Amino acid sequence: MMLGLVMSEKESASEVIFRIEDEIAKSEGNFDSIFVSLKERFNTAELSTIYSLLLGGIKAPNFLRRLICEIDKLREKRNLDDLIDFILDCDNKNFSEPAEYLNLKVLCIKVISNYKEIKAVPSLLYCLNDRKANYKLRLAAAEALGKIGDKNAVESLIDVVSDEDEKSVYVRESAAIALGMIGDSRALDAFVGILEAKKSFLNKFTFLKERILESLSKMDFAGNRRALNAVKKALEDESPQVRINAIETLMNSQMDEAVGMIKKMLLDCDVEVRKNAVIALYNLLGDEILEEIIQDETLSEDCKTEAQGILDGDFEEDYE
């Protein structure tokens, strides 16, 4: 490779790009030698500058994908601005397949989230709130906001998760997950409202309720009667997975009523729900409740088998 003069003061940015574009054309999709050569010749600051030029000028999707991953490894702050510019750029770089550009933007957002820099939040909020954008981009933006954890994103995430007109339930799910990661109590009312809603689509597509219960399990709602009643209602949901998630939420709630509610689930019609109730009670009460379950003649054999298995240590890793 002829990359020795890439940082020459006599070379313009366009010449740098042209030089590496020539190497890309010869590489046949294997870009290892290009990046190995760059890393051998240039220090971190110089690499950051080169990566910035390449991200702004190269149009080869496969190379850009590798470049974005290399930027993630380098994680220089100056390249964060480059990544933000990339996701906000409306130009599709003349890609023959628009899906390629979309996938690169989604990858950029994931890398941006790894920086965990608050300065990226406004741009991510823009992506999240852009109803014309592909749902994959908005979903990635929601997940990134949760990972960064800035509470300035909470209101927008609440708006998305509460929006009954939102076409993509997946975006609402991602917003719910992000709110759980941030852990701000302002989301409680929105979560409870959705669990209380009698919407037919929620019964058909239960994933949103599942995600909300998962997020509630990470939040402190002790003393919030409305939230407790909503979780209690979820124990009666038609979906076994919703009932399982409600059990886990109660287990993590540290509320006095939790044990009694979970004990009732030992009589649930679904075997997996019953097993999860056993596990939850063990996590709350220890070995003593397992002995009680084994001796209880009113309980099913699967409950007893699950309890005995935990006592015997057969599935120890599952309960740690």
Predicted regions and their residues:
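Amphipathic alpha-helical scaffolding segments comprising HEAT/armadillo-like alpha-solenoid repeats
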Residues: 8-21, 41-55, 76-95, 117-129, ...
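Alpha-helix N-cap/helix-start positions at coil->helix boundaries
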Residues: 28-29, 60-62, 102, 118, ...
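Hydrophobic core positions within HEAT/HEAT-like alpha-solenoid repeats
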Residues: 32-36, 51, 65-69, 84, ...
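Alpha-solenoid helical repeat scaffolds
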Residues: 35, 53, 64-72, 79, ...
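Alpha-helical adaptor scaffolds
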Residues: 206, 214-218, 225, 229-236, ...
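Leucine-rich solenoid repeat scaffolds
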Residues: 275, 279-316
